[in-house]
């Protein structure tokens, strides 16, 4: 079981250079867990892709529906106080605090592509490659 952030979710569904390793991650450990915040961040990423011309509106809507059907069951509750406490403990954003806080609560790692976040939280986070090489 791992917690993954929105970047990992996007790479799982939208073809990119990172997609193959993220799909290997899913095959290796499909017990992904997510805070409810993932939906808002995912929506914002799709909105930005449409706004900048990187994706058509109809494709974004289909991806949102696919993401909801795939990822909603993986969502786990996290009290906002825990997200805030985590954010304050590590001097990270409240958004990042939700993902890191859930990983702390579940006693697992956050898999993220965010280098700055990984540096801030140390051993609580890793890249997909690091996770795959450890397991």
Question: Over which residues does each language-model region extend?
Answer:
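Alpha-helix capping/helix-boundary segments
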Residues: 8-9, 38, 99, 116-117
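Short, well-structured N-terminal submotif of metal-dependent ribonuclease cores
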Residues: 1-37, 49-61, 134-135
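Active-site-proximal, substrate-binding regions of enzyme catalytic domains
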Residues: 43-71, 82
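Phosphate- and divalent-cation-binding pockets in alpha/beta enzyme and binding domains
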Residues: 21, 41, 82, 119-120
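Acidic, PIN/NYN-like endoribonuclease modules and their adjacent C-terminal/linker elements
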Residues: 1, 92, 100-135
